[in-house]
Swiss-Prot record:
Gene: TMEM223
The protein, known as: Transmembrane protein 223
Cellular localisation: Mitochondrion inner membrane
Keyword Mitochondrion applies: yes
Mitochondrial intermembrane topological segments: 65-97
BP-aspect Gene Ontology terms: mitochondrial cytochrome c oxidase assembly
Organism of this sequence: Homo sapiens
Gene Ontology CC terms: mitochondrial inner membrane; mitochondrion
Keyword terms: Membrane, Mitochondrion, Mitochondrion inner membrane, Transmembrane, Transmembrane helix
Mitochondrial matrix compartment segments: 1-43, 119-202
InterPro entries registered for this protein in UniProt: Tmem223 (IPR026100), TMEM70/TMEM186/TMEM223 (IPR045325)
Pfam families documented for this protein: TMEM70 (PF06979)
Family recorded in the similarity comment: Belongs to the TMEM223 family.
């Protein structure tokens, strides 16, 4: 029977083996580009862009109509001008307030649609060498926009199994999270989890 002091290196190796195999693959040299994520929703974002543009035009026209002075009917010289009080919807205060409100709603709809389009990720590609990653977003009207950043500047804020719908991705130097829809395709889940899907302190 082996002595206890001879068995502990074997037990220690058995404990450390999963940790060694789960280390990030940042040092692994890739010979070619590898697709890590893909989710093409070009048609949806085209419709979303048209909807937001239509809403912007509608609310802008409402703001212009509100600020325009209504025509004043011709009245006899001896006619008495009625006092409508401060709640008259034709007063300047109400018209300018309504114009500002309509403009704010239109800007909010346009801004939300633009931001969602620019932060919804269509594909993630790990470049050859494993040190650069290219993110492609849907962009307004589904036209697509891409950029390449060092892998060390990308941090996944949650594991794929921890979120129900959207996977938040943080890129250093860029505001707001980039969103990966979990219904998309992950061709290489292990490589994704060890590279782009890993958490980093940025």
């Amino acid at each position: 029977m082996a002595a206890p002091w001879r068995r502990w290196p074997t037990g220690l190796l058995a404990v450390l083996r999963p940790l060694l195999t789960c280390r990030p693959l940042q040092g692994t040299t890739l010979q070619r580009d590898v697709l890590l994520f893909e989710h093409d929703r070009g048609r949806f974002f085209t419709i979303l862009g048209l909807f937001c543009a239509g809403q912007g035009v509608f609310w802008a026209s409402m703001a212009v109509a509100a600020v325009s002075r209504p025509p004043v009917p011709v009245q006899p010289l001896d006619a008495e001008v009625p006092n409508r009080g401060p709640f008259d919807l034709r007063s300047a205060l109400w018209r300018y307030g309504l114009a500002v409100g309509c403009g704010a709603i239109g800007a909010l709809v346009l801004g939300a649609g633009l931001l969602f389009s620019l932060r919804s990720v269509r594909s993630v590609v790990l470049r050859a060498g494993g040190q650069q990653v290219t993110l492609t977003t849907h962009a307004p009207f589904g036209l697509g926009a891409h950029f390449t950043v060092p892998l060390k500047q990308v941090s996944c804020m949650a594991h794929r199994g921890e979120v129900p719908a959207m996977l938040p991705l943080k890129v250093k130097g860029r505001r707001f999270y980039f969103l990966l829809d979990k219904t998309g395709h992950f061709p290489n889940t292990k490589l994704f989890d060890n590279t782009v899907g890993a958490y980093r302190s940025l």
